[in-house]
């Protein structure tokens, strides 16, 4: 790293064979901050980072000058997070692994604020396109108090209004409202339904209708989740209806409210695969898979289904 930028200072081409391949050309070289295998993405492989490079990437991925090298680091870090080799608490400085991989206690104490502060800063940036991406991602994050305040501004904004460089449209208002509902930021189900009805009255488009379906499925009550679940697995919804219903049902990973479906999923999975189109069966089963259940019983049910 020099002058705040991470640039390549040396490159060696080598064919990797076996479990260990020596690189004689680098003997005697000063150790680099970042050693990147498969730089330039010359071959298809799963690549990893050594311990020092991993720690460096956590702090400096945004400083890597080459877009290709930066992308490879993102990919390697994500694979290591999924494999349990990189703690998810290091990953929120990059994407939103907080939901499914981070220690919940750390998320509550530190991770949520860390992630939301970064996303809000991005949403307040000067580039409108980038600001929109950050704002959309914020709606998928575990919400801090600052995030709630920001999303409330988006919901209250008139269509076409600007919040910083961000132009607020109906789709963004729906995303913000759904996030607030899913995180119990409305007093009760009736208050959430009133907010949905108000926004639906202002947005009578086909997109608005589907967004209302998603928002209702996100209401954090056992009854609302049951209604959404039954609709999603009924084979009576359109493809768009299924997609929006399952998105709302699982928004914000409401594990406790979804425990009621742990066994039912495995009972109805064969029927869904038989009755739905292949694409929608795959989407529905993937979205509804009880990833919130991490018990041995869950693993047993999954093994039995696949047997």
Where are these regions (language model features)?
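Long, ordered, helix-rich scaffold segments
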Residues: 2-7, 24-307
């Amino acid at each position: 790293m020099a002058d705040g930028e991470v640039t390549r200072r040396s490159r060696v081409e080598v064919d990797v064979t076996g479990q260990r391949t020596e690189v004689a050309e680098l003997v005697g070289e000063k150790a680099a901050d970042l050693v990147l295998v498969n730089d330039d993405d010359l071959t298809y492989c799963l690549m990893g980072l050594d311990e020092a490079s991993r720690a460096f990437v956590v702090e400096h991925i945004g400083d890597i000058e080459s877009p290709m090298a930066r992308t490879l680091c993102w990919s390697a870090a994500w694979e290591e997070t999924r494999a349990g080799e990189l703690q998810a608490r290091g990953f929120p400085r990059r994407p939103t692994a907080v939901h499914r991989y981070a220690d919940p206690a750390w998320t509550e104490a530190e991770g949520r604020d860390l992630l939301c502060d970064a996303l809000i800063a991005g949403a307040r940036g000067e580039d409108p396109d980038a600001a929109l991406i950050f704002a959309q991602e914020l709606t998928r994050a575990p919400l801090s108090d600052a995030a709630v305040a920001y999303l409330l501004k988006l919901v209250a904004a008139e269509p076409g209004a600007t919040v910083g460089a961000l132009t607020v449209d109906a789709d963004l208002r729906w995303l913000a409202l759904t996030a607030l509902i899913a995180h119990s930021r409305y007093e009760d189900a009736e208050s959430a339904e009133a907010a949905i009805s108000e926004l639906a009255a202002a947005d009578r488009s086909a997109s608005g209708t589907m967004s209302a379906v998603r928002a209702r499925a996100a209401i954090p009550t056992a009854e609302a989740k049951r209604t959404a679940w039954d609709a999603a697995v009924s084979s009576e919804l359109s493809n768009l209806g299924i997609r929006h219903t399952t998105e709302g049902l699982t928004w914000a990973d409401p594990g406790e409210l979804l425990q009621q479906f742990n066994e039912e999923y495995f009972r109805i999975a064969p029927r869904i695969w038989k009755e739905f189109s292949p694409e929608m069966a795959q989407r529905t089963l993937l979205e509804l898979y009880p990833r919130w259940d991490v018990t041995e019983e869950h693993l047993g049910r999954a093994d039995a289904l696949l047997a």
